[in-house]
Amino acid sequence: MPHSLNVNYSFLSKFKKHVSSSVVLIACTILALIFANIPVVKEWYFSLWQHPMAVSVGGFNLFSHGGHSMNVMMVINDFLMAIFFLSVGLEIKREILVGELSSMKKALLPIIGACGGMLVPVLVFALFCPANAAMQRGLAIPMATDIAFSLGVLSVFKTRVPVSLKVFLAALAVADDLGGIIVIALFYSSDLSWLYLGLSALCVAVMIIANISKVRAKSFYLVVGLVLWYMMLNSGIHATISGVIVALCIPATLKKGTGHYLERIRMQISKFPVIDVDDLHKTVVLTHNEIHMLKSIESAADKMISPLQDLEDSLHGVINFFVIPLFAFANAGVDLSQMSIGGLFSGVGLAVMLGLVVGKFLGVFTFSWIAIKTKIVTLPAGISWNAFASVCVVCGIGFTVSMFIADLSYSALGEAGITLLNEAKLGVLCGSVISAVLGCVLLSRTLPKEDC
């Protein structure tokens, strides 16, 4: 029973967190498009991201790569997104340990759906994208499902959405993120430096040994993680992967059992003097001993939360209300004057859009349908096939990770890459909007009606 409560809390709390942040994300996306297309601020908007940044100590600059300072856009896409992937990694680790990916029975349907949702969009992209080596670099763009936007769509329907449907979508998005991380690590690394790779491995070894030695201080892992980020930045492996590695090394267990800390709290509370009813609304000056007891209770309560969950909770606000909105504001700005409508309906833009709208739905639904019909898994309780299909449409909302992979795919190709990147971004935006609107229409028709 406690485990069941844990899982429900995990997904329902995640649902509430992401739906509020999706509004901020939409606002920043719209602002980016406005700023990128209004002549008065357009030049300022695009030049803003090219300003060099430095965090220097003596002659050492943390934000440097290959001897050159990083600009604002690089810091957002390489450093802040590493923090985003740290959060994603913590989420994946928690779900594997105690959540919806903790057993094969629970994890199988979202994993099978995610596999289809990654494979088929790639095939659709390859089918509609011209056989050009530069264009084909974006094969992985339509693979991702944006958890904030997709859960935001479900939030529109409030209590009409069965919990099992929310759980499926959230678990699929987590599995999707894991697939995206693997793709980034394998296919977006280049010019490997064995020296920096060796130093990166040393950082990982230090964190693993610290975990085994029961080092529970989050600050230790974050400091070593910062060093790891710099080493990976210069190693040739994409630096954002460092966030996932740090997440996997952060302890998910307590130093002592929960019972030990609960008993300590109960003991201190029992010793605390009873406050007279008449004094409840008065300012009470505590003795040193009472302050010590309260601090002891606070310390024990803090130690009942594992470093993994504590850090995940602490990062929530930073990720959802700073990192992702800033990423959207920096990356969603597409100069529409440089593009034609025909550009969207050909080449990269069309391939990305169809990969998200058609590929995602076909992949998630078809793979899930086959698995259910062959009795490998079962359809989640309380869900009709029509409602399930509607949620598969919502899976085509691919924003954050899709935009990120688009940048990795085309940003290094010079002038030609800028055009392809803009087409890809527009494809992501259009595909995501179509999937969201279509998903809303279908869900409104297929979900159970609210009781009057």
Label each region the model flagged:
Residues G59-H65, S69, M73-V98, V318-M339, ...:
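Hydrophobic transmembrane alpha-helices of secondary-active transporters
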Residues M74-F85, A133-A148, S189-L202, T240, ...:
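Structural signature of hydrophobic alpha-helical transmembrane segments
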Residues P2-K17, K218-V224, S242-A381, L447-C452:
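Predominantly late transmembrane helices and immediately cytosolic-facing juxtamembrane segments
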Residues N6-S13, L86-S102, L151-P162, A205-R216, ...:
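C-terminal ends of transmembrane helices
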Residues T29-W44, N331:
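Alpha-helical transmembrane segments of multi-pass membrane proteins
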Residues I111-L151, T159, M353-Y410, C430-P448:
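Transmembrane alpha-helices that form the ion-translocation and gating core
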Residues E95-L123, S193-L202, Q338-G359, W385-C392, ...:
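Entry/N-cap segments of selected transmembrane alpha helices
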Residues L154-R266:
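Functional cores that coordinate and move charged inorganic groups
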